[in-house]
Regions:
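A charged, aromatic-enriched C-terminal amphipathic alpha-helix characteristic of glycosyltransferases
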Residues: 125-152
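Conserved acidic donor-binding segment of nucleotide-sugar-dependent glycosyltransferases
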Residues: 95-96, 100-107, 115-121
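Short glycine/serine-rich donor-binding loops of glycosyltransferases
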Residues: 68-71, 89
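Nucleotide-activated donor-binding/catalytic signature segment of Leloir-type glycosyltransferases, i.e.
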Residues: 26-46
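Aromatic "clamp/platform" in nucleotide-sugar-dependent glycosyltransferases that forms part
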Residues: 63
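Short hydrophobic beta-strand element within catalytic cores of glycosyltransferases
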Residues: 80-83, 93
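Short alpha-helical donor nucleotide-sugar binding micro-motif in glycosyltransferases
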Residues: 42-43, 50-55
Length: 160
C-alpha cells in the first residue's frame, strides 16, 4: 500500500520488485493487484544477481530481521540501501553516503526517504561507495553475530 502511495507522489518512473516468499505474499499480491509490482518468489545465484543488477536502490523495510544479510548482498551488488536505523543496517550504512537510515519504527519518515531518493546518477555513485565499503567487511561480522546468538540460545558465555 505504501508503494502505491509513493507512486502517486513521484513524478519518476518507479517499479517495485519483491524477491522472496513468505506468509504475507498472498496478501501483498492482492494489495498490488493491477499495479506494476513484480513478485519473483525466492531467488538464488545468477537469478538473484540479475535482480540486484537491474535495480537502482535497495529498500529494506524489515523491522524484525536482525542479521540483514540481504543488506550486505545489496551493497556488495553496488546498491545504496534505504533501511531502518536498527540492527545490521545501522552498522553498515553510512547516512547519505552508502544509503539512508530512518529512525526505527517511523514509517512516515521511511516512506519520505524513498520519495526523496536522488537521481539515478547519484544512486550509482552511492552504490559504488557501498560496494567498496562492504568489500572491506567480509563475512566476519554476520558470522560473529550468528555465533553470539547461538551462545545466547545455549546460555553459554561467548569467547571474547
Amino acid at each position: 500500500q505504501s508503494y502505491l502511495n509513493i507512486k502517486k507522489e513521484q513524478s519518476r518512473k518507479l517499479k517495485m520488485v519483491i524477491v522472496g516468499d513468505g506468509p504475507d505474499r498472498k496478501r501483498l499480491t492482492e494489495i498490488a493487484n493491477g499495479s506494476d509490482v513484480i513478485f519473483t518468489g525466492s531467488l538464488t545465484g545468477q537469478s538473484l544477481a540479475q535482480v540486484y543488477a537491474s535495480a537502482d536502490a535497495f529498500v529494506f523495510a524489515s523491522q524484525i530481521e536482525t542479521f540483514g544479510n540481504v543488506v550486505l548482498e545489496a551493497m556488495a551488488s553496488g546498491l545504496p540501501v534505504v533501511a531502518y536505523n536498527y540492527a545490521s543496517p545501522q552498522r553498515y550504512i553510512k547516512q547519505g553516503i552508502t544509503g539512508w537510515l530512518s529512525p526505527f519504527g517511523q514509517v512516515a519518515h521511511f516512506m519520505q526517504t524513498i520519495i526523496q531518493l536522488p537521481e539515478q546518477k547519484v544512486l550509482r555513485c552511492m552504490g559504488t561507495q557501498a560496494r567498496q565499503d562492504i568489500e572491506s567487511v567480509g563475512w566476519q561480522y554476520p558470522v560473529k553475530q550468528f555465533e553470539q546468538a547461538l551462545y545466547h540460545a545455549a546460555n553459554i558465555k561467548a569467547a571474547p
